[in-house]
Amino acid sequence: MKDLFKNISIPEIITGMESKFYPIFNRYNITGNLNITLFNFNFNENESIENSFFYNKIYGDSEYIVPASILKLFSVNYFLNIIESNNLVDKKITVGDEIRKTYINPGLHRVGLKKGQSYSPLELVELSLVPSAGDAVYTLSRVVYNILKNNPWNDFSWLKSKADWIEMIQFICSKIRDYYRTTLNLDLNLFDPTGIQRDLIQVKDIGTLVSSLINNNSKILNIVAKSQTTKINGRTYNSTNAFVRKDKPYFYHPKIIGLKTGSLSGWKNLLLLYKLKPINYIAILVAGCENHSDTKKISSLIIKELDNKLFNISF
């Protein structure tokens, strides 16, 4: 068995899944949106971030998906960068009017933040990514808006109407797009930091972001690996990702770090990171499913194939 696989490469394993599992994948394409893309990150100091990975779409007709909450990875990474560069990581953020129900989309997933509650920035990052709380994303948005506008960072007295809220979102999203255009050469369709809008992005852009997170040893990777948040205001929140939760033994896998789930109609998505060694990872993107059960079944099939094929390979 070892001799059989010793010369096979990870890109060859990934590419081989396209024909091997096509009939199975095809049965899950109920929405017509199904996209399954695998990425291999194997870092070389002489390569740029955008060229430091291999990726292959093993099922699907398009290079674009509706990311839903996967888009939060882009937003939160930017917010964390701004907050850290302004030395606010140890401060307390007060929830303001940015989470008013009359402002936000009624379909947005929330954890029920209340005006006047206080959280640290990293607690809000955890809430944004682990239970995928849209209200936490909006609170981070308002703080970063204040920083960029040279307002007192915890202020929300200016937020008096839906028009003010919309201006905040438009401004923040323009800054996020500018940031990724400048730092990673990405042209993102990002018009709400939570991913609630149905804008299309390229799957390769997701790979570029994940490559950057790994290369920079981002705090985000430690956060999305958690099965639940730390205790926040006396409460913990479970991850939306079954593959990092030991209480979900059918799916839990010790090599999976996380990354993000996403959920809009016709776009139930799952992005996982399979760790091979400190500088070698495989990301699994399953997007466009009808339900989350299908994203997990497809991902389980791919993980089992990786386990079987990678077991005898020396890296």
In which residue ranges do the predicted regions lie?
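Penicillin-recognizing serine hydrolase domain
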Residues: D3-K57, E63, G112-G116, P121-L124, ...
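Boundary segments of small protein-protein interaction reader/adaptor domains
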Residues: Y103-N105
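Active-site SXXK
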Residues: I65-I93, I206
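Short, well-structured active-site flanking segments
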Residues: N81-R100, D187, N217-K226
